[in-house]
């Protein structure tokens, strides 16, 4: 009997450039492979035994001749290389038109509407920036004037940063809800609240970030599961990404270690349904900051935490580990990279095998749909291959 399926998304842990990566400025990107070489090798015994070394060339993680999980990689069919696009495609929504980006900052009509409708005293920034850098550059002026820091990136995001002593958290969230409504017609994927704390020169972002996503333009596999009475637990930023559609329970997390511990605890009480987990630290703390050493430590932390999750799985359960895009910390860019993503599928007691290169992330959603007996419109299920 199919009971529980766990998806762990190692946010940004791509495994090699897609054929069209050059068009995105990402030729040669390989988040996992390049990170391993930058640090002189990774120690990932659990992931190695699962077959991660078959997915791309990872220094320190050779291909295991008898992997314990099924291994492969997935290519993104949608245009883009961001969190929203990647997660939506995983759950059966392929975007034919990329989401809107603003490489020159946001036009006056957006900024003026934001200021007018929120009552904010203006904005600072309105540029493409690294979030950790711009709060150091503008944080003191923000605290003096009360103006929030607005910025974007190569992704379709409108980010609003504010010090929690200057703009209360709930006020920041309210401003972002207003921005979400303003930006819906502009096809901006996410409005992100970026609270920070600290003193000038030592500002630090908190885990109270909140994403306000535009709703998916089509029905996702998650919604079909809920309609069929299947519980769906969203861990980390999963509920935000899907605008809380197709989610029956939300679990907030404070980083990867917390998310992994909460996932293990969930498996002690959840006896049926989908547990969908996003592990954001790879992307937020290390990929965007071009920190391969930190990225390597996070991968090794994941490896150490996996046994507590795998040991809680029983006959009929499945676990899939994947990513939503790349964010190669070894390249000059601090933005996401257009990459394949790894696919490891663990079925207790069934050994492993090669799932090849899937032509869309939606193959994962199609597999989830078949596992729980609901319809999917996009992708090819590999359920038979991992349960034979």
Swiss-Prot record:
GO terms for molecular function: magnesium ion binding; manganese ion binding; phosphopentomutase activity. Its cofactor is Mn(2+). It comes from the Bacteria. Its EC number is 5.4.2.7. The gene is deoB. GO terms for biological process: 2-deoxyribose 1-phosphate catabolic process; 5-phosphoribose 1-diphosphate biosynthetic process; metabolic compound salvage; nucleotide metabolic process. Mn(2+) 1 binds at residues 11, 324-325. Belongs to the phosphopentomutase family. It is an enzyme of class 5 (isomerase). InterPro entries: Alkaline_phosphatase_core_sf (IPR017850), DeoB (IPR010045), Metalloenzyme (IPR006124), Phosphopentomutase_DeoB_cap_sf (IPR024052). This is Phosphopentomutase. It comes from Anaeromyxobacter sp. (strain K). Mn(2+) 2 binds at residues 283, 288, 336. It catalyses: 2-deoxy-alpha-D-ribose 1-phosphate = 2-deoxy-D-ribose 5-phosphate; alpha-D-ribose 1-phosphate = D-ribose 5-phosphate. Keywords: Cytoplasm, Isomerase, Manganese, Metal-binding. HAMAP family: Phosphopentomut. The keyword Lipid biosynthesis does not apply. The keyword Cytoplasm applies. CDD domains: PPM. GO terms for cellular component: cytosol. It is found in: Cytoplasm. Isomerase that catalyzes the conversion of deoxy-ribose 1-phosphate (dRib-1-P) and ribose 1-phosphate (Rib-1-P) to deoxy-ribose 5-phosphate (dRib-5-P) and ribose 5-phosphate (Rib-5-P), respectively. Pathway: Carbohydrate degradation; 2-deoxy-D-ribose 1-phosphate degradation; D-glyceraldehyde 3-phosphate and acetaldehyde from 2-deoxy-alpha-D-ribose 1-phosphate: step 1/2.
């Amino acid at each position: 009997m199919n009971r529980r399926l766990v998806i762990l998304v190692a946010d940004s842990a791509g495994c090699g450039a897609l054929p069209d990566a050059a068009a995105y400025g990402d030729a040669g990107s390989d988040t996992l492979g390049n990170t391993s070489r930058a640090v002189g090798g990774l120690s990932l015994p659990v992931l190695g035994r699962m077959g991660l070394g078959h997915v791309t060339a990872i220094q320190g993680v050779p291909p295991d001749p008898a992997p314990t999980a099924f291994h492969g990689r997935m290519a993104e069919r949608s245009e883009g290389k961001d969190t929203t696009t990647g997660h939506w495609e995983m759950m059966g929504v392929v975007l034919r038109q990329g989401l809107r980006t603003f490489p020159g900052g946001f036009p006056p009509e957006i900024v003026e509407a934001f200021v007018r409708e929120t009552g904010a005293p203006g904005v600072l920034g309105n540029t493409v920036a690294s979030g950790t850098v711009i709060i150091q550059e503008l944080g003191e002026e923000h605290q003096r004037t009360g103006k929030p820091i607005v910025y974007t990136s190569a992704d379709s995001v409108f980010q609003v940063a504010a010090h929690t002593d200057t703009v209360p958290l709930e006020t920041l969230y309210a401003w972002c809800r207003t921005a979400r409504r303003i930006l819906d017609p502009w096809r901006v994927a996410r409005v992100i609240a970026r609270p920070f704390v600290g003193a000038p020169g030592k500002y630090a972002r908190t885990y109270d970030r909140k994403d306000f996503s535009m709703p998916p333009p089509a029905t996702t596999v998650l919604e079909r599961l809920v309609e069929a009475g299947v519980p769906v637990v969203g861990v980390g930023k999963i509920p935000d990404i899907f605008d809380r559609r197709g989610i029956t329970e939300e679990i907030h997390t404070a980083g990867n270690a917390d998310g992994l511990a909460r996932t293990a605890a969930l498996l002690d009480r959840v006896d049926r349904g989908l547990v969908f987990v996003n592990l954001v630290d790879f992307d937020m703390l290390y990929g965007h900051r071009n920190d391969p050493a930190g990225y390597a430590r996070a991968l090794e932390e994941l490896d150490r935490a996996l046994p507590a999750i795998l040991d809680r799985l029983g006959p009929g359960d499945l676990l899939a580990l994947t990513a939503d895009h790349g964010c190669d910390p070894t390249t000059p860019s601090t933005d996401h990279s257009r990459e394949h993503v790894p696919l490891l599928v663990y079925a207790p007691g069934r050994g492993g095998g090669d799932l090849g290169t899937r032509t869309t992330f939606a193959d994962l959603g199609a597999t989830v749909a078949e596992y729980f007996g609901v319809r999917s419109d996009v992708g090819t299920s590999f359920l038979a291959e991992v349960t034979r």
